[in-house]
Amino acid sequence: MTNIRKSHPLFKIINDSFIDLPAPSSISSWWNFGSLLGVCLAVQILTGLFLAMHYTSDTATAFYSVTHICRDVNYGWVLRYLHANGASMFFICLFLHVGRGIYYGSYTFSETWNIGIILLFAVMATAFMGYVLPWGQMSFWGATVITNLLSAIPYVGTTLVEWVWGGFSVDKATLTRFFALHFLLPFIISAMVMVHLLFLHETGSNNPTGIPSDADMIPFHPYYTIKDILGLVLMLMALLSLVLFAPDLLGDPDNYTPANPLNTPPHIKPEWYFLFAYAILRSIPNKLGGVVALVLSILVLAVIPLLHTSKQRSMTFRPLSQCLFWLLVADLLTLTWIGGQPVEHPFIIIGQLASILYFLIILVLMPLASIAENHLLKW
């Protein structure tokens, strides 16, 4: 009799994805982030579900329902801060996961990569809408500023903004629909994650060398299950340390003030994980130009596979490309810092230079470095 995990239609899918899956023997800890993202998503859905049981999406009571969760609900403060800081952990893992994909040339799996980009957009949209729900000052003004960007679209812009708002300003209708969409999107993301995995398992995983590893595969379980559990324990330790010792470290103090349409905060800024894109948006004086640059800052990832000019897949043995990659990382950190600064000298010019450098590295310098490395290999 065959093992039930290999014969049962449902268990067979799980078995082929997480147990008997052939995996390259050389994949490093940079390959842990896929499973960590899965755990982050599960944590967010669970904590979010329990928060939704106590939250009310009405402008009059939203802020106070969150206060009620923190003060009166059993371990409500843990739920709230796990959810808020879980989002930060989600984005840390996302950025590292995408960075790994760029460094090791995983973007040559085009279907997996493109679904990953759509997933990134979906997670960013979900996080933005979630930030609006507590209905603090930064929630309200963040929603106003970001949704207002749609008005830059020629001809239909203003109509589109009012359609998104459900009125002539960010109000009750906006909050209600953002709550509905914020609740719905994670389940759509879960379905897309399955498609992401489906396409990944069509090709098998990449590895640090970038060389096909068909001749040297090992079963996923127990080798990578135990490795993933180690990564999971480390991530949960970091998340719990953040939640229990410094829950407001990554938040904005302005969000502890109830939303007031008559009082604008001195510095409107999004959560830290959007600051790099926000800095690119602000670096262009023209509204439409800024919106285009904002979208392109993420959409540029879709162009990376088309600009792969190297004869090697991974950057492991390509020192020039490695230098440019780490320059890109430093540039993104600079943009993140600038996004949180006021719009004044010298931050304006630093932001503009960092924005230009961001697109220059990805679109021009990396492909040129790859061509140079190809020529160096001939010697």
Curated annotation (Swiss-Prot):
The record's annotation in InterPro entries points to:
Cyt_b/b6_C, Cyt_b/b6_C_sf, Cyt_b/b6_N, Cytb/b6-like_sf, Cytochrome_b, Cytochrome_b_C_euk/bac, Cytochrome_b_N_euk/bac, Di-haem_cyt_TM
Molecular function as annotated in GO: metal ion binding; ubiquinol-cytochrome-c reductase activity
Where is heme b b562 bound in this sequence?
83, 182
GO cellular component, alphabetical, reads: mitochondrial inner membrane; respiratory chain complex III
- Amino-acid positions noted as binding heme b b566 in the UniProt annotation, renumbered to this chain: 97, 196
Q: Which domain of life is it from?
A: Eukaryota
The transmembrane residues are: 33-53, 77-98, 113-133, 178-198, 226-246, 288-308, 320-340, 347-367
Q: Where is the signal peptide?
A: none
Description of how the protein assembles with itself and partners: The cytochrome bc1 complex contains 11 subunits: 3 respiratory subunits (MT-CYB, CYC1 and UQCRFS1), 2 core proteins (UQCRC1 and UQCRC2) and 6 low-molecular weight proteins (UQCRH/QCR6, UQCRB/QCR7, UQCRQ/QCR8, UQCR10/QCR9, UQCR11/QCR10 and a cleavage product of UQCRFS1). This cytochrome bc1 complex then forms a dimer.
This one is known as: Cytochrome b
- Protein species of origin: Rhinolophus pusillus blythi
